Curated annotation (Swiss-Prot):
It comes from Saccharomyces cerevisiae (strain ATCC 204508 / S288c) (Baker's yeast). Belongs to the GatB/GatE family. GatB subfamily. Subunit of the heterotrimeric GatFAB amidotransferase (AdT) complex, composed of A (HER2), B (PET112) and F (YGR102C) subunits. Its main location: mitochondrion. This is Glutamyl-tRNA(Gln) amidotransferase subunit B, mitochondrial. The keyword Transport does not apply. It is found in: Mitochondrion. GO terms for cellular component: glutamyl-tRNA(Gln) amidotransferase complex; mitochondrion. The gene is PET112. PANTHER family: GLUTAMYL-TRNA GLN AMIDOTRANSFERASE SUBUNIT B MITOCHONDRIAL AND PROKARYOTIC PET112-RELATED, GLUTAMYL-TRNA(GLN) AMIDOTRANSFERASE SUBUNIT B, MITOCHONDRIAL. Its EC number is 6.3.5.-. Pfam families: GatB_N, GatB_Yqey.
Amino acid sequence: MLRLARFYSLARTKAIHSHGAPFRPEYALKCGLEIHTQLNTKNKLFSQSTNSATSLVDAPNHHTSYYDIALPGTQPVLNLEAILFAMKLSLALGSQVNSISQFDRKHYFYGDQPQGYQLTQHYRPFARGGKINLSKELDDIDESAKEIGILQLQIEQDTGKSHYTETDKDVITLVDLNRSNVPLIELVTKPDFSDIKQVRAFIKKYQNLVRHLHISSGDLETGAMRVDVNLSINEYARVELKNLPNTSSIINAIKYEYQRQVELISVGDTSSLMEPETRGWTGSSTVKLRSKETTIDYRYMPDPELPYINLAPDVISGVRGLMPQLPDDIMRILMKKPYQLSLKDAKILTYNSNQNDMYNHEALRSYYLDTFREFSKLAGERSNAKLPTNWIIHEFLGDLNKLQIPLAKAKEILPPPVFAQFLKLLHEEVISATSGKMLLFHILENFEQSNCQDLSIPDFSKLIEKFELHAINQVDPQELMDLCNDVIAQHTDDTFIRNLVTGKKKSSLKFLIGQGMRRSQGRIKANEFEKKFKEILNIQW
C-alpha cells in the first residue's frame, strides 16, 4: 500500500514538472509571498558583531558577541544602518514609512534561538503599503500589467542555524550562531498572484531591487533571501509552504500544491482544506508540518529594552532625495532613442548577478553610456546606435569573460573615449567587423598576458598597419575569385554543394562566407563573398 502511494505521488510530481500544473479558471489560485531578506550591514542588528552570516569559509560561532549568544545581562543596541536600508527599500516600493515603529518579542524555544524569543515588529511595523508593478513588456507575464500589493515591511533579527550529524547511536545537533541577530527585512505581499509567471517575475524583480539598492546580496542559495508561499484555491483555507531554497523549488512547490488541492476539491474531499496548515517541500512533494491546532502561540509583547523608532519627516525626505533611479525606469530609457536597446540587452545593463565577478551592472552601464556619448560626438548625426550595443555588450564582454579580465582593469587601457575611437573605425569601415574582432581580442589578450600591468593605450592605426587589417574598398576580382574557388575546392562532398545550390540547406552559404572572411582576414566584406559564391555556383534562390 505504501509503495503504491509513493508511486502515485512520484507519478503526479513527474507529470506536474513535465507539463506544468494546468491553472484552470474553475480552480482560482490566490497566492501571496513572505520574503525574508538579510541586510548586508557592516554589523549585526543589535550588537557590534561583524555581519558575515552567509560566509562559507568562516568557522562556526566566529562572528558572535555576548548578546548574540544571549549571555544574561547583555542588552540590545540598535544598528542604525539597518534602519537606513529598510527606509531605502520601503521608499523604492512606494511604501508608507511609519514615523513611529517598535520592536516586539516573539517567544518560542528552539536550539538556534538562545534568547527564547525573536525581536520583530509585530504591532508597529516599519512600513505599510507599497507595490511592485509587473508588465508584459519587461517581465514576460501574460497580462499587459499586474500590480502586486505590499502589506507591510518589518525589521527583525535572524536566528542561528542548526546542523544535524548522524552517528551510529544517535543524531547530534550542532548550533552555529554566526547568523544569530543578523538583520532581516520581512516583506509580506497581498495575495495578488494568480499564476506562476507572476511569482517568478516578482521574485526576480525584488531580488534585483535589493541588489540595485546595495542592501542585500539577494541570493536564495545562501539563504540571504528566503521565500515562504501562502496559497489557497477557491477561497478554501490558506496553506503555507516552507523549505523553498531556490526559485525552481518555489515554482514546483506551488504547482504541486495547486494540483494536490485541485484533486481533493474535484473528488469532494475538502475536509483537510477547511483549516489553515503549514506544509514543507521535500523536493518532489509537499508534506504536512502543522495545522491550526498545533500553531504556536508566540505571546508577542513589546520589548522593554528598546525604545520606539522615531523618524522625523526631514529624515525620510532626506533619504528619498538620495534614492537612485530604479531598474524599470532605467530599462525603459535604454529601450528608447537614442539607445534603442533590446529588452535582453537592457537587462544586462540593469540586472545585477552576484555570480559575475568580471563586472557589476552599474559599472557596465556607466561604461556603455560614456562610450555611447563619446561615439555620438565622433560620428555625429550618422552615428549607428547599434554599434556601441553590439561591441560592448556582446564582443567586449565576451572577450573579458573568456580572458577573465575585470571590467575595472580593462577600462584602464580602453577607457570610453578610446573605445569610441575603435567604434569610429568600424563605423567608417576603415576595418571590417571581422578585423575589429581580431583587433579587440589581440589588445585584450596582450593586456591579460602582461598580468594587466601594461597600461599603455593601444595605437589602432599602428596595429591595423602591422596586421594588414585595412578593409579593401576596391576588391580585386581575380583575388576574390581565387579565394572563393579555394574555399569551394575544400568541399569534395557533392551532397554539400548540391544541397546548397538547390536551397535545401541554405545555411551552408553562411559557412562558405565565414571561411572566405577568415582567409581574407576580414578585409573583404561578407556581401562581396556572397555575390561571388552565388555567381560561381549559379545559385538562383
